[in-house]
Amino acid sequence: MRFKELVFLLKIDEEELLEKLYEEGFFNFAIEENKEGDRLLRVYLREGETLPSFLSNWKILDERLTTPKDWMVELEPFEIVEDVVVDPTEKVTRTDKIVVKLSPGVAFGTGLHPTTQMSVFFLKKYLKKGDRVVDVGCGTGILAIVAKKLGASYVMAVDVDEQAVEVAKENVQKNSVDVIVKRSDLLSEVDGVFDLVVSNILAEIHLRLLEDVDRITHERSILILSGIVDTKENMVREKASKKGWNLLERKQEREWVTLVMKRS
């Protein structure tokens, strides 16, 4: 599949950008910093797909036709947290670390973002062998794959975006792990009871998740919420508290916060 890649100078903060992109159901993008320290937004349009409306007045810095492999080619294997390696090259053969192979699908969700890194950090810390885990808003499926490789007995990964679901399925197959991947608007298509719920999405969407998460958890379940901008942390914590969830731990990288919750 070929994409049109458009590059913009990022004019707004990352939180506002993500909200606008997600509101329009747009998930194929990457945020990066160039050598001059400028923040750039790269968006990838499929054939027939239109640009998010708020970008129509932004100046295009660069434009080209590309394939997913083109934008992944510069990524080298890297250790997302201690002993967990993300490998877009499929060249890593070592067996002393957990290795996650990623297919060149969507640009967002390679593991480079601090919200993904913090989520993996807490998965390593709180996931117990034999746990049942659900990854809500799975993107490329990286968190679900890590959970399975950490020893979870059953893992489900869900996302509202059909392309993300297809990419996650491809990555699950590439890693030879048993993970159920399906399209779902948060927990609408999720049944059963889970020991750990991990979700790397926007703060406002966490509020919706908290309305329904009790249905699929028990009194000892762990809830990992990532993708929260620090200015909206209290909003999420207050909602969680009202729903009977207490804070166990938090971690912050730059403006991004990840919370670990347990039932009170």
Curated annotation (Swiss-Prot):
Molecular function as annotated in GO: protein-lysine N-methyltransferase activity
Q: Which Pfam families has this protein been placed in? A: PrmA
Its recorded reaction(s) are: L-lysyl-[protein] + 3 S-adenosyl-L-methionine = N(6),N(6),N(6)-trimethyl-L-lysyl-[protein] + 3 S-adenosyl-L-homocysteine + 3 H(+)
Q: Does the keyword Lipid metabolism apply?
A: no
Q: Which residues bind S-adenosyl-L-methionine?
A: T116, G137, D159, N200
The protein's UniProt keywords, in alphabetical order, are: Cytoplasm, Methyltransferase, S-adenosyl-L-methionine, Transferase
CDD domains (UniProt xref): AdoMet_MTases
GO terms for CC?
Answer: cytoplasm
Superkingdom as given in the UniProt entry: Bacteria
Q: Which residues cross the membrane?
A: none
EC number from the UniProt entry: 2.1.1.-
The listed locations are:
Cytoplasm
Its chief place of residence is: cytoplasm
Could you tell me the Gene Ontology terms of the biological process aspect for this record?
Answer: methylation
According to its UniProt entry, the function of this protein is described as: Methylates ribosomal protein L11.
- State the family it belongs to: Belongs to the methyltransferase superfamily. PrmA family.
* Entry protein name: Ribosomal protein L11 methyltransferase
Record organism = Thermotoga neapolitana (strain ATCC 49049 / DSM 4359 / NBRC 107923 / NS-E)
| UniProt gene name | prmA
